[in-house]
Amino acid sequence: MQIILLDKVVNLGNLGEVVKVKDGYARNFLIPSGRARRATEANKAEFEAKRVELEKAAAAKLAEMQAQGEKLGGTTVKLTQKAGVDGRLFGSVTNHDISAELTKQGFPVLKSQIRMPNGPLKTVGDHAVSVALHTDVAVDITVTVYGETA
C-alpha cells in the first residue's frame, strides 16, 4: 500500500515521503496513530496544502524535545530494591520503575521512551540507560540501584 508520511517514522521515512508498506502495517498502525494517510490523489493535494503547517509543527516539536533532552541529560535516577548479599536483586528494575521516578523528578517520560539495551536491571550499581524523547533526540541517563537487605 502506498502511504504519505505525516511524521518522521524510524526506519521508514520522513515527513511528506510517499512510501510503500505492507497493508496491515498501514491499516493497523500507521493510519490509526495519525502518522500516515493513504496516497490517493485527493490526500496528496490536501497534504501539499498543509505541508508548511505540518513542517512547522514537526520543527517545533523537535525543538521542544531537544530542550527537554538538554535538561534531562546527565540526570541520575536513584532506586532502591530488595537485594541479596551478592548484589543481585530479588526482582528487577524495569522501564516502568524508571519512568515513574523520572516523572516524580519533574521529567514526564513514557515507559515506551526508555531504552534498556540489556533488558531489566537485575544487579545493584550504576547502569546507563537511554531515553528516546523523539526519533532524533536520545539522551543517556544513569540509573543507580541501591540494595535493601531483605
Swiss-Prot record:
Determine if rRNA-binding is one of this entry's keywords: yes
Q: Which organism is it from?
A: Polaromonas sp. (strain JS666 / ATCC BAA-500)
Q: What does this protein do?
A: Binds to the 23S rRNA.
Recorded family membership: Belongs to the bacterial ribosomal protein bL9 family.
NCBIfam families on file:
L9
GO BP terms, alphabetized: translation
InterPro entries annotated for this entry? Ribosomal_bL9, Ribosomal_bL9/RNase_H1_N, Ribosomal_bL9_bac/chp, Ribosomal_bL9_C, Ribosomal_bL9_C_sf, Ribosomal_bL9_N, Ribosomal_bL9_N_sf
Record's GO cellular component terms = ribonucleoprotein complex; ribosome
**What are this entry's molecular-function GO terms?**
rRNA binding; structural constituent of ribosome
What name does the UniProt record give this protein?
Large ribosomal subunit protein bL9
Return any one Pfam family short name: Ribosomal_L9_N
Q: Which keywords does this chain's UniProt record carry? A: Ribonucleoprotein, Ribosomal protein, RNA-binding, rRNA-binding
